[in-house]
């Protein structure tokens, strides 16, 4: 069976995701579509608005298989996020990887990837890296004549292409043009499509504007309890105050003494937003700081990075998805696909189990990695 992977967050699932999944499967002529989905925390440095089990149920409206992107990668910047997703796609023996972009032109991505390979070897690139500038910022400064880097989705798409070239050259990348709404639009202004940001805003404001841009079949899942980043504040504050600077310095993505700034400002902060205002500097992007704070909350350390992919957690599957897994196991019997976490395999998903515990502590929910079996449709 031919398969296409989609790297997703589905935070939450909406019509744009359905369109992407359908188009990806059709254009690549695939038999199976696989969502490699972030768990309970997402790339922007936030808890997902719904837990991973609810979002997996939503996803099965469009795909045949939902697997979990490891938690460490889910709260990482584009390069590591993409690398891990591509390695999982390769582990799942996929033929294609499809991503949404404003460009919609695969040749543009392939050409720019080739140019960046050369740029990264230049002394100027290395000099800017030593200055502490973020990778996206360096590229935007050195590549001024290419609009491809002007949007987050295009930049992430480029990371997928480069990760495929490095770690899984047998996978064919493909891009689908994003429809209508921009990634960070704050308001729902279209009758069929809207950004995840605007949908989350609608939910937080307790309006029902989201109903027009979400498949009717999953409206029931939207009625479930949801959380926001502000809900993490008291737990985050405790996590920071219970450590000293030496301990905080070991947190994943902590650098250049920012742990001291965090300790100096945390007692003044009255909310997550207030803390972000106190911490914001020209040196670091808003998202970088937000991710860093989630790493503190989750207690992810620099040495916790998984060495390789040696198992994949299956969150949900259709009958066709189950058939596909059986096909892979027949060809690669050593590969480990886990549909139920238990005492025997829990050591393979330490970070994910911990992230779920923290998410449940914040949200008051009880669905965890041990008591929630694989979702089947």
From Swiss-Prot:
Please report any disulfide bonds recorded for this protein chain, giving both cysteine positions.
none
Q: Name one GO cellular component term.
A: cytoplasm
Which EC class is this protein assigned? ligase
**UniProt GO MF annotations:** ATP binding; ligase activity, forming carbon-nitrogen bonds; tRNA binding
Q: Does the keyword Transferase apply?
A: no
Name its cellular compartments.
Answer: Cytoplasm
The entry assigns this protein to a family as follows: Belongs to the TmcAL family.
**Protein function:** Catalyzes the formation of N(4)-acetylcytidine (ac(4)C) at the wobble position of elongator tRNA(Met), using acetate and ATP as substrates. First activates an acetate ion to form acetyladenylate (Ac-AMP) and then transfers the acetyl group to tRNA to form ac(4)C34.
Q: Which protein, by its recorded name, is this?
A: tRNA(Met) cytidine acetate ligase
The scientific name of the source species is Staphylococcus saprophyticus subsp. saprophyticus (strain ATCC 15305 / DSM 20229 / NCIMB 8711 / NCTC 7292 / S-41)
Q: Which gene encodes it?
A: tmcAL
